[in-house]
Curated annotation (Swiss-Prot):
Catalytic activity: 2 reduced [2Fe-2S]-[ferredoxin] + NADP(+) + H(+) = 2 oxidized [2Fe-2S]-[ferredoxin] + NADPH
Top-tier EC class: oxidoreductase
Enzyme Commission (EC) number: 1.18.1.2
Identification of the protein by name: Ferredoxin--NADP reductase
Keyword Translocase set for record: no
Length: 331
C-alpha cells in the first residue's frame, strides 16, 4: 500500500503515554504545532493498557490518583493547543528529509517534522494475537479497544476478564451496543465504579455476563461457548478479544540511535546522536532504571523546550514560569 503524505508538523512525538502527552503539551504551549503518534487505539500508554485502575501515589503534589484519571487530566491539559493526536499508528521508519528535518513512516502515512521526541516507553504496545479456532470465519474480530461510538445497534461479544474488557463492555453498552461479556474465570476485574456499572447493567438485564465460560470457536454468526459444561451459541456482529498487550521495540531499534540495549543514549537536553531527535521516559539512557513518572515529566519538559528552540531559534530556551505567563500559548 502506498503511504500517504500527512501534513507537516513542527514537532512529532512518538508515543502517547504520560511522557509523550506532557512533551506535547509543553511544545504546543510554546506555540508550536505538535503531532502525537500512538500505536494503540487510545492514548495513555502503559497507564491505560496495563493498569488503568491502579492508584499512583508519587505524582508530585497529587497524594493519589488512578492511572486512568491521570491520563484524562493530561489530555484535558492539552486544552485548545495545537496537538494532533493520531492513534493506531506505529512508527516504523526514520529518514532525513533533506532540509534538516525528519520523515517518520507508519504503515499508511509519512509524517514530516522539524524535530522528533521519542516517548515510546517499552515499545509499541500491540494486542496479543487472536488464536481461536474459526477466527478467520467471522467478519469482524478485534483485539484492541475500539471507539465505542461506531457500535450503536450492533451485537458485541467482549471476551476477557482484564480491566480493559470490563471498561470496553460498559462503554460499548453506553454507546448503544448490545453487549455480552464473557471470561474463562469467575468474576471480572476493574475499578469499583466500572464493576458497579457492570452489576447494575446485569441486574437490569441490559448486559449478559457469562463467567466462567470457555470460548470454543468463532463462527460466521458469532461464537460457540461452553458455560457450566453446556454448549452455548452467542450471535455477535463484532467479537472483541482482549488478552492484554506485548511491547515491541523492534521497528525503533533499527533506527541509528546508538542503542544501549533497550535504552537510547541522550545528553542533558534529551537529544540523541541525531540532531533534532530527542528521547524521554523509559527509553532514555539518562534515566537509568528509575522508571518514574516524575522523572519522565521532567525529561518531557526539558526535551520539549530544547526541541522548540531547535525548530524556532528565535524562541528562548527557557519558557519562564507559567504563573507569570498564564493562558495559551507561551512564546
Amino acid at each position: 500500500m502506498q503511504s500517504k503524505q500527512a501534513p507537516d508538523t513542527e514537532i512529532l512525538v512518538i508515543g502517547g503515554g504520560p511522557a509523550g502527552l506532557h512533551a506535547a503539551f509543553y511544545a504546543a504551549w510554546r506555540g508550536l504545532s505538535v503531532r502525537v503518534l500512538e500505536a494503540r487505539g487510545e492514548v495513555g500508554g502503559q497507564l491505560l493498557a496495563l493498569y488503568p485502575d491502579k492508584v499512583i501515589y508519587d505524582v508530585p503534589g497529587v497524594p493519589q490518583v488512578r492511572a486512568a484519571e491521570l491520563v484524562a487530566a493530561l489530555c484535558a491539559q492539552l486544552g485548545p493547543l495545537d496537538v494532533d493526536l493520531r492513534t493506531g499508528e506505529v512508527a516504523r521508519t526514520l529518514e532525513p528529509d533533506g532540509t534538516g528535518g525528519w520523515v517518520i513512516g507508519t504503515a499508511g502515512a509519512r509524517h514530516r517534522a522539524r524535530a522528533v521526541i521519542l516517548a515510546a516507553g517499552m515499545g509499541a504496545l500491540l494486542p496479543r494475537e487472536v488464536r481461536v479456532p474459526g477466527a478467520d470465519t467471522h467478519p469482524d474480530v478485534r483485539a484492541d479497544l475500539p471507539d465505542p461510538a461506531g457500535f450503536a445497534g450492533r451485537r458485541v461479544l467482549v471476551v476477557g476478564g482484564v480491566p480493559q474488557a470490563t471498561r470496553a463492555a460498559v462503554e460499548l453498552l453506553e454507546a448503544g451496543a448490545t453487549v455480552t461479556l464473557t471470561h474463562r474465570r469467575a468474576g471480572f476485574r476493574g475499578d469499583p465504579l466500572t464493576l458497579a456499572r457492570l452489576e447494575t447493567a446485569r441486574q437490569a438485564s441490559q448486559m449478559r455476563l457469562l463467567a466462567p465460560a470457555v470460548l470454543s470457536r468463532l463462527t460466521p454468526q458469532g461464537a460457540e461457548l461452553v458455560v457450566e459444561g453446556a454448549p452455548l451459541a452467542v450471535r455477535a456482529d463484532t467479537v472483541l478479544i482482549l488478552n492484554g498487550y506485548l511491547p515491541d521495540l523492534s521497528p525503533l531499534q533499527a533506527w541509528p540511535l546508538a542503542w544501549d540495549g533497550e535504552y537510547v543514549p541522550d545528553g542533558p537536553s534529551g537529544q540523541t546522536v541525531l540532531p533534532g531527535v530527542y528521547v524521554i521516559g523509559d527509553l532514555a539512557r539518562s534515566g537509568g532504571d528509575f522508571k518514574l513518572l516524575s522523572l519522565a515529566f521532567a525529561q518531557a519538559a526539558v526535551a520539549a523546550n530544547h526541541a522548540a528552540h531547535h525548530v524556532r531559534p528565535e524562541l528562548k530556551m527557557r519558557p519562564g514560569h507559567s504563573s507569570e505567563r498564564g493562558g495559551y500559548p507561551v512564546r
